A protein has these predicted regions:
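Core catalytic region of metal-dependent phosphoesterases/phosphodiesterases
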Residues: 7-10, 15, 21-91
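Binuclear metal-dependent phosphoesterase catalytic core
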Residues: 2-5, 10-21, 35, 42, ...
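Short acidic, glycine/proline-enriched helix-loop-strand junctions
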Residues: 63-71, 135-149
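Residue-level detector of beta-strand structural context in well-folded domains
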Residues: 86-87, 133, 158
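Short, Asp-centered acidic motifs that coordinate Mg2+ and/or phosphate
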Residues: 46-47, 96, 124
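Glycine/small-residue-rich loop that forms an oxyanion/phosphate-binding "nest" at active or ligand-binding sites
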Residues: 71, 77, 83-99, 105-120
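Active-site-proximal beta-strand elements of phosphoester/diester hydrolases
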Residues: 22-28, 95-102, 142-147
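Active-site environment of divalent metal-dependent phosphoester hydrolases
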Residues: 30-34, 55-59, 77-82, 104-109, ...
Length: 165
């Protein structure tokens, strides 16, 4: 699996990021647990974010790596679990949106996702669904899709390192 590293520096947060936080971003695993476990072992993240499809994979991963917090949302293939389709978290003063992306129609446009992020003061919007890795920045908002860590010849995930600017 390809691992893409993105160090994102946020200046002007009102306080300095004292400790570099390493986030492993996974999406669209579709029951492929072992590549995720290997990515965790390689990356050694502080947090794991799973962006849906399938949410049960995130639960199984959390059981395997109990020392690392796993935050997840549901996606378009999580028919039996619609518990949390999106969530917002704040780490070191950076507000982060986690979603699968299908409700924002990310296969055709990123505008609804960008507008939701802007409206909610989000600096980092994480989404999946397209199975294609993407990194875009607009007006201080970073949009990131890690790609699919599931059944693909081009399986990928992303690592985000939060640092102060």
């Amino acid at each position: 699996m390809e691992i893409r590293l993105h160090t994102i520096s946020y200046a002007g947060l009102g306080r300095k990021v004292t400790t570099l936080k390493r986030l492993l971003i996974l999406s669209d695993s579709h029951r492929f647990l072992e590549p995720m476990v290997r990515a965790v072992e390689h990356v050694k993240p502080d947090y794991i974010f799973h962006l849906g499809a399938l949410s049960a994979d995130a639960q199984q991963l959390a059981q395997r790596v109990m020392q690392i917090p796993v935050l997840s949302v549901t996606g378009n293939c999580d028919f039996l679990d619609r518990s949390q389709e999106q969530r917002m978290v704040e780490l070191e003063g950076v507000k982060i949106l986690l979603c699968h992306g299908h409700r924002y129609h990310v296969k055709s446009t990123l505008l609804p996702l960008y507008l939701a992020a802007r409206e909610n003061g989000v600096r980092l919007a994480l989404f999946g669904h397209t199975h294609t890795a993407l990194l875009e920045e607009k007006d201080g908002i970073t949009l990131l899709n890690p790609g699919s860590c599931g059944p693909s010849m081009r399986a990928s995930c992303a690592v985000v390192e939060l640092s102060g600017g």
